[in-house]
Amino acid sequence: MGRDGLPTAGGYSQGITVEQDYVCHIPDSIPLDKAAPILCAGITLYSPLTRWGAGPGKKVAIVGMGGLGHMGVQISAALGAETHVISRTRSKEADARRFGAVELHPTSEPGTWESMAGQFDLLVSTLSDGVELDDLVACVKPEGVVAVVGLPEHRQEFLMRNVVNDQKIIAGSSIGGIAKTQEVLNFCAAHDLSL
């Protein structure tokens, strides 16, 4: 039953009624099938990227090139940040560059983690497993931010001194509110992003 007491048809419905405070306008330039991912994965990446200042003069790393990561790369690059991808292998390097990354760092190759030490202002991890938090923290500059949007199944441990000594920040982020969702829709339309 719906709020009005009438039966609902779920996914078979021809229309819905919602409160206007929870409606976003999808710009005409975004086809509806392209808008759907922006409303979940797009806002999930846009929120920490804008909150932590991705933009011109900033060096940003997106960890993982899956559904979330490929959106993060496009959004970060469109914000004007020097955007990098951290991935296990080079298999997605062409996509990373096509989406706006200047470099892909393959962690399966020797010396990759060491070469990234202290390189990034902001690192956004989309991974749910397979990387140690200490490795991510080591990649950001003093006062840099590691924003985690992936949800690991197991406990994450790290050495607190790796955060404290350089005043680094570890933050979590999960989607965004209605105003921020409208903002990412408008941003994607303005930058012609086809997420």
Predicted segment positions?
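C-terminal substrate-binding/catalytic core of Rossmann-like NAD(P)-dependent dehydrogenases/reductases
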Residues: 153-195
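A glycine-rich, Thr/Ser-enriched phosphate-binding loop motif common to dinucleotide/cofactor-binding enzymes
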Residues: 7-12, 28-51, 63-71
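Glycine-centered, small-residue-biased loops immediately flanking beta-strands
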Residues: 144-145, 168
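Acidic carboxylate diad motif detector
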Residues: 149-150
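Glycine-rich phosphate/adenylate-binding loop and adjacent beta-alpha elements
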Residues: 1-23
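Adenosine-nucleotide cofactor-binding segment
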Residues: 56-65, 77-135
